[in-house]
A protein has these predicted regions:
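Polynucleotide-recognition surfaces of large bacterial nucleic-acid defense/processing enzymes
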Residues: 1-129, 134-145, 151
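Basic, amphipathic alpha-helical recognition segments used for DNA target recognition
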Residues: 149-198
């Protein structure tokens, strides 16, 4: 191995030497040392709109006590679950106690991981008042989103969540702006090129 390495340093024409222009790494968001990226991919990255220009990525709620605040949807009275609410204001002023909860989960591409509901009576006042809980980005609760789990054993998988879900700290979510639909965003996130780039 040492002899081949020395030969590759001395002779740029050996067939096992791979050279890249280091300035190209600066063109890739986050500047990873991605020696495998071709000129064509660099060109696509340079010409493409940045993800941060069309979405807002947010992390959600951490209950700090899932046994107290979370249930599987079939464990509670069905008529106490608030489906399809579009804002925390509407949820707070309803007679509903439990609301759909995006907690992430196993590999599910396009759709899925919708098993949980969260105790969110009167707009989640118990969670807001719990000193151990962290309620992040509540202004984004109940909005349409694309989500993925923070822990995965294989490739990332992105899923669609319609309006009406509160999201967890492990069910990361992105919220499309008016320049892209959630369905188009989902298609982009689940395609092979995007998978290769992340």
């Amino acid at each position: 191995q040492e002899i081949k390495t020395l030969e590759a340093v001395r002779n740029p024409n050996v067939n096992y030497r791979h050279s890249v222009v280091s300035n190209n790494f600066e063109k890739i968001p986050g500047m990873p040392i991605a020696y495998w990226v071709s000129k064509r991919i660099i060109d696509i990255i340079e010409q493409s709109q940045k993800m941060g220009d069309v979405v807002e990525a947010k992390q959600g709620c951490a209950t700090a006590n899932n046994n107290k605040y979370l249930r599987l949807w079939h464990e509670v009275e069905f008529d106490k679950i608030g489906f399809n609410y579009v804002s925390n204001y509407d949820a707070k002023h309803s007679n509903k106690i439990w609301f759909p909860y995006n907690k992430g989960g196993s590999f599910r591409k396009w759709y899925g991981n919708r098993e949980f509901v969260v105790f969110w009576k009167r707009g989640g006042i118990d969670l807001f008042n719990d000193p151990k809980a962290v309620v992040r980005n509540s202004g984004y609760y109940f909005k349409e989103s694309v989500s993925w789990s923070d822990v995965t054993s294989s490739k990332n998988s992105f899923r669609y969540y319609n309006k009406g879900f509160i999201f967890d700290s492990t069910g990361h979510s992105v919220f499309p702006n008016k320049n892209i639909s959630a369905n188009k965003l989902l298609a982009v996130c689940n395609n092979k090129f995007f998978e290769m780039m992340i």
